[in-house]
Amino acid sequence: MISKEKKNTLHIASCSFGKDSLATILLALEHGEPLDEAVYCEVMFDKRTSGEVPEHRAFIYETALPRLERLGIPVRVLRSDKTYLNLFAGTVTRGPKKGLRRGFPLCGHCYVQRDCKLRPIRRYNRTLTPDTVQYVGIASDEPVRLRHLQGDQVSLLEKYHYTEEDAKQLCQTAGLLSPVYAFTDRGGCWFCPNAKRKELRHLYDHHPELWARMLELQAMPGKVSEKFNRTERFSDIDAAFRKEDALCSKAA
């Protein structure tokens, strides 16, 4: 249930439906912390296809979101009018790369995060009163991230001394742990240039239709860069996985 202690101050929880943000909500409920709503921003690959790994998106909409609403926590879903695909295909309008397609976002300078996630969140934040309290999912064993909290941001995981592993166990016990933790320790879009090898291998093995979309983008001419991440083209990763499969088949 939503706490009635809030009076005139709004309390919201930033929620990716990962272990830390869901554990934050569970702690708020357990300890009677004021909480008015959870806010989730969904990045889209195109107008119909989510940027969430399919298993995580199914978990969000089929398990976690309905569960939170049954517990009395309304969930506000934000989306940008821009998608990964139309940003990728967009044309650079100035500078030495003028006329080229933007192509794959750069690690550390992700235009997708900026335009598809941060801007909708900031637009929503501008509608809030200055005294709004935002709960963020940063664990007690993340000191660097905790030091960067703004004045209106609160970590309930720090307050109640929950580490990342504690948060994971809390979600597991509550039946609210995303299945993506079976193959990754981080959240992120399935097209993220920071994706680890294990995450990419999961996409290759289990979602060939999405993998094929990325190969189509790799083949698109006139991009700023051919690199998917700092060192490789997406087609290089595809070739490496095909080689691994061939070696496994030969060994068998």
Segments (PLM) and residue ranges:
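Nucleotide-activated chemistry modules centered on ATP-dependent adenylation/adenylyltransferase
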Residues: 1-252
